Amino acid sequence: MKIYKKLFAYVQDKKYLGVLAIIFSAISALLTVYGYYLIYKFLDKLIINSNLSGAESIALKSVITLTSGAIFYFVSGMFSHILGFRLETNLRKRGIDGLEKASFRFFDLNPSGQIRKIIDDNAAQTHQVVAHMIPDSSQAIITPVLVLALGFIVSIRVGIILLALTIIGGLILGAMMGEQEFMKIYQESLSKLSAETVEYVRGMQVVKIFKANVESFKSFYKAIKDYSKYAYDYSLSCKRPYVLYQWLFFGLIAILIIPIVYFMTSLASAKVILLELIMILFLSGVLFVSFMRMMWYSMYISQGNYAVDTLEALYEDMQKDKLVHGNVNNFKNYNIEFENVSFAYNDKAVIENLSFNLEEGKSYALVGSSGSGKSTVAKLISGFYNVNEGSIKIGGIAISEYSDEALIKAISFVFQDSKLFKKSIYDNVALANKDATKDDVMRALKLAGCDLILDKFPERENTIIGSKGVYLSGGEKQRITIARAILKDSKIIIMDEASASIDPDNEFELQKAFKNLMKDKTVIMIAHRLSTIKDLDEIIVMDSGKIIERGSDKELMSKDTRYKSLQEMFNSANEWRVSNERVL
């Protein structure tokens, strides 16, 4: 099937385990049905011929045969489970390897929690379709054919009854199997509910503070209602067929007793009928299990299809709009040039025909309202996205001409939301430069103003962040991030609102760290706190993806400019105080 072709592509070296699982499962089915044939011969000796001594040897053979069938099924399951676990591992590895090479755009658009959930949960969803369904589907196909053959060996009546059961059971089974499109919608609603639940839990502080109920979170509430509806509809669609299915198989013997007793004419015929009833009881149970396996097979195939399609869509998205790198490793200089650059997010234009130059060694601030394009400019310089039109150059060469390693080494990015790993403070800084010595790392920590942070902990730079109650404030995290950037020693520094939410206690230390980081570098700073950019060489004011003003703080403040009005609004907001006076 198509699903297995997709899945086995990720376990080429272990594909033989699937073949072995099918072979052992088929042998198990043959042994199991042959075991029931021996049971029939045993009952024939015992009931019809009353030959107890002959029945004993057959009984022993049937026990050995059925036990052998169970062992072969266990071995089949062992093969398929090894294959299933290897598949899950490889799907997760494929995701992790893809993350290492993914475009910056991918990380910009996809939260880390969502990525982890998609990879982990969908890899786990493939387990049933491989580990359980490979042996079960083999038995579900082979066993009914063998059971029907055995039924006709017992008697024409038994064969006809089992054939009728097979036909009716197959029709009922078809009614119980969900349509592929419906199952896809059901899976999507379940994924949506899981994602919204995570967001709801993350916002639990807000929920408690404002005593908000679940209806207040519209997307979460809608996800609950949608999933509830689809789960209820699916249950209702299966209710009648499933009840009829169980009634058909489990009530069959009771249904047959009355006509059998009515047509029974002698003790001999009673013995034959009793034997047939017992065999119908046994063989209908085997058919019931086979049909149930087919039903689960349909459901797990739908789950597996959805899981692998979701994962492959994620893998594809990782490479989407990825900057194709060249092989240039050296920069002539670090001047940055935009030439008629246009860029759009999902067909929504953000920057159109933008051109400007930034000189090496100077510091620049990008200011403007939300959506003006300043963050997009910074991300385009870093190679987060491919431009739709035009080109971006560093040192007179398009950034796409540089190798990946050269571009990463040349540019450091300091984000507003600092990310630190659950490792020591030292390791969090040292990862910026694998060749750095301990003296280099400690110097970077000192220049970033981290001495006061280290003094708080007995183990200083060896303190593990996030363990034993060790947690850092936003400003402290930012200083460690700056130490990392100092150690990397890139020639271009991009700071995306790096001081936007820093508390006053940390601001002074942070500003000193910024000065050490920015020394002799080309700096692009995106700032909302306009007080932090007055000393920069040049301020670039953006609006609707265009540069509307450019100059030093002194130049722009001396004229009637948009920048001047932004500074006045910023200063006015800072002067505002909450008073105890009643506002009339």
Which residues make up each language-model segment?
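Cytosolic ends of transmembrane helices, especially the final helix of ABC transmembrane type-1 domains
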Residues: L193, A212, K239, L287-E316, ...
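Helix-to-loop junction immediately C-terminal to a conserved catalytic motif
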Residues: S382
